């Protein structure tokens, strides 16, 4: 393990000056303003302009090695000091595209699971490596839960090259940051396929969380992998979680490249249901909780009118205030909202929230960004160019964008939501965000991961900053980074 205490200073003056210069050039017709340098035009409910400042929590420079391919993250108080820590996973895929099959290339078993322990301020973090290499080859996602009942959160990681691994928090002994966490690869998952998402939730209300995960069959599915079906499963533990015999798998169903299985009380009846997504079938599946303390979930199709979703990243909220949870997800370049029908079994109607074209909609998070008491949506895209250098891409290519959609209120499901762009760099993949007021200043910030952009991959937090004057909308953490680009 590597212990790296850091303190990140705030430095904004040079960026603001360069942004002003670029805006001035654009106004005279000599240059087109980039997204990040564009003066903010969005006013929050308090009358101030919304700007965004980027801060680094973890990256290759902090880690001391080539950290890359940053994907999933979760937050929880691992050491019970009253501050939320961050667990993140890093796939180490800068030399290949894990979404493209290649039978002649075998990815090396590389990757890192990192913890950033929170300090006294949001600029102070203590970073360690929790797992790496064959323990966590190409880790894609992570979940937290107290599986052994000691009051401390344990960690479960989904490794896209292989398996699910359980890492047990050492707990009250005071060695959380320095001790080797005991671990177990769940035996029924070893060398059985590929796991890309993982969640932990108490599905049967017995006080012990279960693990939910979909086995998508292969990290880089080939046509043969799409033709076969692999399971969506619940993994439950009875006894010591470090013993393989304590774990049992309950298969909910088999599908073509299933890539997600999320716990959510979709019918608001007080117990957790499961929403799964299949990439091969390009559809969503609902498993209803029987509510009797068993894991005998009932499968139902989710019929959708107006679009198709494979369900890799999903969010849930009652956006139209009808008392029913809706589903929000990405469909290519579009952000889509599926309205839950009044009657179970009827079709879910799709409403288009907005588009990032030519960029994709990949990661997303809901929160009241502008302070008007409704839910807005932050989104991030997935750059498709080179991963270790900017390369010959232009404004019409799929680049790495951050943007947010402002909830228009009562007409939310009848018209596109206003889009407010934050940054658009040649390289950046933004898989996961968590909304949180990091600096306790009363407005919403976001923690996220960034991939596809070595050596700038890692974990960051995006500070919402409000000012009376409309300066550049985005202030990056680094002076040197992937090139900021205009819109098409």
Q: Residue spans of the language-model regions?
A:
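Bacterial N-terminal signal peptides
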Residues: 14-26
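Positively charged, low-complexity intrinsically disordered regions
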Residues: 3, 16, 31-33
């Amino acid at each position: 393990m590597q212990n790296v205490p850091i303190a990140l200073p705030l430095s904004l003056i040079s960026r603001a000056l360069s942004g002003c210069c670029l805006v001035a050039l654009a106004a005279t017709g000599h240059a087109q303003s980039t997204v990040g340098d564009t003066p903010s035009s969005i006013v929050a409910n308090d009358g101030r302009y919304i700007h965004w400042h980027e801060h680094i929590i973890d990256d290759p420079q902090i880690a001391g090695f080539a950290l890359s391919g940053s994907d999933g993250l979760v937050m929880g108080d691992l050491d019970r000091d009253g501050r939320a820590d961050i667990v993140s996973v890093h796939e180490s895929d800068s030399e290949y595209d894990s979404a493209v099959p290649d039978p002649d290339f075998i990815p090396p078993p590389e990757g890192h699971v990192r913890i950033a322990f929170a300090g006294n301020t949001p600029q102070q973090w203590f970073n360690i490596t929790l797992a790496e290499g064959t323990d966590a080859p190409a880790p894609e996602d992570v979940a937290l839960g107290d599986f052994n009942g000691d009051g401390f959160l344990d960690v479960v990681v989904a490794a896209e090259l292989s398996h699910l691994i359980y890492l047990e928090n050492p707990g009250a002994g005071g060695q959380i940051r320095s001790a080797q966490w005991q671990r177990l690869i769940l035996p029924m998952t070893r060398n059985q396929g590929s796991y890309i998402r993982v969640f932990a939730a108490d599905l049967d209300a017995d006080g012990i969380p279960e693990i939910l995960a979909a086995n998508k069959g292969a990290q880089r599915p080939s046509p043969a992998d799409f033709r076969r079906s692999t399971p969506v499963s619940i993994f439950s533990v009875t006894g010591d979680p470090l013993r393989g015999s304590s774990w049992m798998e309950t298969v909910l169903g088999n599908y073509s490249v299933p890539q997600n299985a999320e716990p959510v009380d979709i019918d608001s009846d007080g117990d957790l249901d499961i929403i799964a997504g299949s990439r091969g079938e390009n559809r969503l599946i609902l498993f209803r909780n029987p509510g009797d303390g068993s894991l005998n979930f009932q499968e139902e199709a989710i019929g959708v009118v107006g679009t198709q979703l494979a369900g890799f990243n999903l969010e849930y909220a009652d956006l139209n205030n009808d008392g029913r949870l809706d589903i929000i997800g990405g469909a290519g370049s579009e952000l889509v909202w599926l309205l839950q029908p009044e009657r179970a079994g009827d079709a879910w109607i799709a409403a288009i929230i907005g588009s990032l074209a030519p960029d994709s909609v990949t990661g997303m998070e809901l929160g009241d960004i502008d302070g008007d008491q409704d839910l807005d949506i932050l989104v991030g895209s997935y750059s498709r160019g080179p991963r270790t250098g900017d390369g010959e891409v232009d404004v019409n290519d799929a680049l790495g964008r951050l943007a947010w959609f402002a909830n228009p209120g009562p007409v939310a499901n009848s018209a596109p939501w206003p889009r407010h762009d934050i940054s658009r760099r040649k390289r950046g993949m933004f898989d996961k965000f968590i909304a949180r007021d990091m600096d306790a200043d009363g407005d919403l910030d976001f923690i996220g991961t960034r991939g596809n952009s070595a050596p700038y991959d890692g974990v960051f937090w995006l500070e919402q900053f409000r000012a009376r004057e409309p300066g550049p909308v985005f202030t990056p953490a680094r002076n040197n980074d992937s090139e900021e680009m205009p819109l098409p």
